[in-house]
Swiss-Prot record:
Zn(2+) binds at H196, E199, H323. InterPro entries: CPA_M14_CPD (IPR034248), M14A-like_propep (IPR036990), M14A_act_pep (IPR003146), Peptidase_M14 (IPR000834). Substrate binds at H196, S197, R198, E199, R254, N271, R272, S324, Y325, Y375. One of its GO terms (biological process) is proteolysis. GO terms for molecular function: metallocarboxypeptidase activity; zinc ion binding. The lineage of its organism: Eukaryota, Metazoa, Chordata, Craniata, Vertebrata. Belongs to the peptidase M14 family. This is Carboxypeptidase A5. PANTHER family: CARBOXYPEPTIDASE A5, PROTEASE FAMILY M14 CARBOXYPEPTIDASE A,B. Residues 34-126 form a propeptide. Residues 1-33 form the signal peptide. Its EC number is 3.4.17.-.
Amino acid sequence: MQGTPAGGTSPGPSPMDRQTLLVFSLILAAALGQMNFTGDQVLRVLAKDEKQLSLLRDLEGLKPQKVDFWRGPARPSLPVDMRVPFSELKYIKAYLESHGLAYSIMIKDIQVLLDEEREAMAKSRRLERSTSSFSYSSYHTLEEISSWIDNFVTEHSDIVSKIQIGNSFENRSILVLKFSTGGSRHPAIWIDTGIHSREWITHATGIWTANKIVSDYGKDRVLTDILKAMDIFIELVTNPDGFAFTHSMNRLWRKNKSIRPGIFCIGVDLNRNWKSGFGGNGSNSNPCSETYHGPSPQSEPEVAAIVNFITAHGNFKALISIHSYSQMLMYPYGRSLEPVSNQRELYDLAKDAVEALYKVHGIEYFFGSISTTLYVASGITVDWAYDSGIKYAFSFELRDTGRYGFLLPATQIIPTAQETWMALRTIMEHTLNHPY
């Protein structure tokens, strides 16, 4: 059930209904071993100035942690979204009100959305089993995606192959799909999805994109020209341990699952673990933080695997890392406000890409450098790519702008993937036509 964006009220369950729902949710979570988020809300705060932003940043340092920022405090012009556990709602709302921080309720009860999501997945799974098919309009588990990859590669072995580039902390295979028409060391394009495990729309978009490539090769002139001259690599599940955990225990888990002696909290933010700007602004040295950068650059096997693979290949010309949510297309730098040397070219290309995206379903995206469009973030994928000589480095933030956040309904998978494809196609075509 959604809270009204303007901060008003909407009809809710009666006390008896709510008690019944709570009991049902707790039983369901216990049976499935999954965390329960009944009563948790997502609040949106729009800070007026830097002072109010500072007050919001103070919430991240509370011990024990009381909020989970979905969109962190960045600048006064950008909303801050945070999940607040039911047990902390009274405290957090009082804190906001006492400091004059106006808020609205974006999601009134997270568990309601989670139950709807789980029910939709179960329904889709039953249909897939009865028809022996794979639904591109549904969310899937790691095991289902792995099975799909094997079948997909077998069915399209003339153009697709599977490469294992490493193993995760929990020893899961890190797999990449390679799309190629033959030859060795072609110029290449890298696409990764799901580096933050709770961003399920990114995995689903990647899967749809992979199928789109094989479906349109030989029919779409632009794509055909790209694949005749270049290879495309897609890593669908960049954070396999975290992704598996979002299905088995905590749907809202962001980091990987690495464990270190003497540290109570688990996991590293894989998008803060890269060498470029490691440990700088927009990352955190606190292992309990959602943006914990890890003990050292590329300490995480999931990051090291990509670095080693791309470096050994030596001929990648574009890298696109796909995240959610906020509807943005961005380029380096994230670590500072310093413009990159080809800033104008990247700006114009991003503009063309979001215009192509808009034409599909009328969805508007912001675009620009990461540090000026979203926030300063150090140790991130695209900064590393650019500093490693990959000229066309971009990061997407897919749908939506906060109504559902990381819990985007499966009904939006296909539209999201369709529009994202047109932006990807634009970037890849430009990369093809501007060799370096």
